[in-house]
């Protein structure tokens, strides 16, 4: 297991720039090459580079797992093509909300999603990502993809998450769930870490105790 720290042009919110699964990572063009090498090393994945809807905030805008990738409705065809060529299912989320990566907390077992997404959106998510899809919140935060992070072994969620919310995540994703923070106390763990079951890249400002908790909860030791 490899866990490394990184920032992008001084920004420790590494999860905003990169979306990753067990098999691949989608990285923004503005991410420096040395950070891309760390991603490859830590996660042991194939890396492709593209913007999403013309933005470098790939992690915030794209929801991925090993089964597929969900783009926002303003995504461009050449961006979608880059990910489709990885051989995974690709579709556009039918929603006016564009930050798809922030709307969806997923691993290869299922997904917890923003409570305001309609039934048609949930059907598309299930078709692309597979597994069970359930609406929910984490600590009063509707953008569950920003408030949580998961791999195939564990999940870490917003420290304000209730027992009921944590149980729902555990049931849907099929993993143990713990609360935690990144980058010196940020509750938005999904923004501060990129992870799969083989390793993680965490925000540069993450403290030793935070890192230890993340490693334990995500079984990265």
From Swiss-Prot:
For this chain, one GO molecular function annotation is: translation initiation factor activity
UniProt record, GO biological process: cytosolic ribosome assembly
Query: What are the alphabetically sorted keywords of the record?
Result: Initiation factor, Protein biosynthesis
> Mind telling me which Pfam families this protein's record contains?
eIF-6
Tell me the HAMAP family matching this sequence: eIF_6 (MF_00032)
Q: Which NCBIfam families match?
A: eIF-6
Q: What function does the entry list? A: Binds to the 50S ribosomal subunit and prevents its association with the 30S ribosomal subunit to form the 70S initiation complex.
Similarity comment: family membership: Belongs to the eIF-6 family.
Please identify the protein, giving its name as recorded.
Answer: Translation initiation factor 6
